[in-house]
Amino acid sequence: MPLLLTGKKFHNDLKTNKCLAIFAPLEGGYETRLLRRMRAKGFKTFITSARGLGDPEVFLLKLHGVRPPHLGHQSVGRNGALGEVQQVIPQASELFNENDKNKLLWLLEGQVLSQSELESLIEICTKDNKLTIVVEMGGSRKLEWKSLSNYILDEFEN
């Protein structure tokens, strides 16, 4: 049986565009196949969901605070009116531990992101030469992808 998806065109497009919007069939399988191909080409990969991302640059790359859920009546004198803020390490911190490898951040459910959040992902890629980002933007009958900047122009400018 011939290899249906070698990943060569995907790899070339990823290198030239740095940020891709991908549309994969809903039955799945293509994502893991492409990730396996990218790992074989020397990428360090990290998969996470885009839901609840907030400010992508802060959430993925910087130390930020998160308030725990409210668990009923608590003493106001201890933590003030706003409550306790816990410091959380960046979600993609394990991706940035190695500086010598190319890095691939794969975001699932990217259709929930706004135009400004998608644009900030493109800015993150331009700041770090070794970082590439793939955002799954929904389902399709066949595997398709385009640059994230072209997707923003097509989707939001009309």
Swiss-Prot record:
Alphabetical UniProt keywords: Membrane, NAD, NADP, Plastoquinone, Quinone, Thylakoid, Translocase, Transport
Catalytic activity: a plastoquinone + NADH + (n+1) H(+)(in) = a plastoquinol + NAD(+) + n H(+)(out); a plastoquinone + NADPH + (n+1) H(+)(in) = a plastoquinol + NADP(+) + n H(+)(out)
InterPro entries per record: NAD(P)H-quinone_OxRdtase_su_N
Main location: membrane
Cellular localization per UniProt: Cellular thylakoid membrane
GO cellular component, one term: plasma membrane-derived thylakoid membrane
GO function terms (MF aspect): oxidoreductase activity, acting on NAD(P)H, quinone or similar compound as acceptor; quinone binding
Membrane topology, from the record: Peripheral membrane protein
Protein family according to the UniProt entry: Belongs to the complex I NdhN subunit family.
Name assigned to this protein: NAD(P)H-quinone oxidoreductase subunit N
